[in-house]
C-alpha cells in the first residue's frame, strides 16, 4: 500500500520497538534508509537491538525526537509513516510542521489511524480519528490530500503530499 522501492528514504515516527521499521527496511534495501524516531531512548535501544538481530542496523538510523519535532534531516525523506501515533501527539501542529520540513518536495506523509466514524471498531473514541478530522488538521499545512486506502479491518491509511514547491 505504501509503494516503497529500493533506495527510498523513510521515517517511522513513533517507531517504538521497530515493527514497521524492520519491514520497511526490507523494502528500501541497502541503498535506502529508515529514520526510526521516538521520544523514548529506551524504545530506540530496543529497536536497534531488534535491527541488529535482523541485520538491518546499517539501514535503520535511530533518532531521538521531542514531542514537537522528530528531528529529521531537512528535505531528506520520501515518506513519513505514523501508525496509531498522530492522535497521541501532544503538539500535533508543531510536530506536523517539523515533519513537513523533513519531507522532500512531493514527499508523502502517511497516517494510519483507527476509524473514528466506525462504532464497530472496539477502541476508545480518544484513540480514533475520522477522515474528516485528519483532513481538517492537515489543511493548515502545505500538504494536499492524495488518497485514502481502506485495506485494514479497523484503520484508515491516509496519504498526504508535500507541495512540490515547498
Tell what function each PLM region has:
Residues 8, 32, 107:
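Glycine-centered, small-residue-biased loops immediately flanking beta-strands
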Residues 68-80:
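A short acidic, Gly/Pro-enriched loop at the edge of an enzyme's catalytic core
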Residues 11-70:
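Class I SAM-dependent methyltransferase SAM/SAH-binding core
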Residues 141, 146-166:
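Core SAM-dependent methyltransferase catalytic element
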Residues 1-9:
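Conserved alpha-helix/loop element of class I SAM-dependent methyltransferases that forms part
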Residues 108-135:
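Conserved class I S-adenosyl-L-methionine
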Residues 77-93:
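A short SAM/SAH-binding and catalytic strip from SAM-dependent methyltransferases
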Residues 25-29, 93-108:
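A short glycine-rich, Lys/Arg-flanked "PGG" loop and its adjoining helix->strand segment in the class I
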Amino acid at each position: 500500500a505504501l509503494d516503497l522501492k529500493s533506495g527510498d528514504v523513510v521515517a517511522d515516527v513513533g517507531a517504538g520497538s521497530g515493527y514497521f521499521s524492520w519491514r520497511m527496511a526490507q523494502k528500501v534495501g541497502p541503498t535506502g534508509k529508515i529514520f526510526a524516531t521516538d521520544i523514548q531512548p529506551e524504545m530506540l535501544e530496543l529497536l536497534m537491538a531488534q535491527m541488529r538481530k535482523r541485520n538491518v542496523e546499517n539501514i535503520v538510523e535511530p533518532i531521538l525526537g521531542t514531542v514537537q519535532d522528530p528531528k529529521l534531516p531537512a528535505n531528506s525523506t520520501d515518506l513519513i509513516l505514523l501508525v496509531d501515533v498522530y492522535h497521541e501527539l501532544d503538539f500535533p501542529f508543531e510536530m506536523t510542521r517539523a515533519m513537513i520540513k523533513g519531507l522532500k518536495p512531493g514527499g508523502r506523509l502517511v497516517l494510519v489511524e483507527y476509524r473514528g466514524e466506525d462504532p464497530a471498531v472496539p477502541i476508545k473514541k480518544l484513540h480514533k480519528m475520522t477522515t474528516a478530522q485528519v483532513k481538517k488538521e492537515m489543511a493548515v499545512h502545505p500538504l494536499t490530500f492524495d488518497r485514502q486506502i481502506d485495506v485494514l479491518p479497523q484503520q484508515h491509511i491516509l496519504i498526504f503530499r508535500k507541495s512540490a514547491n515547498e
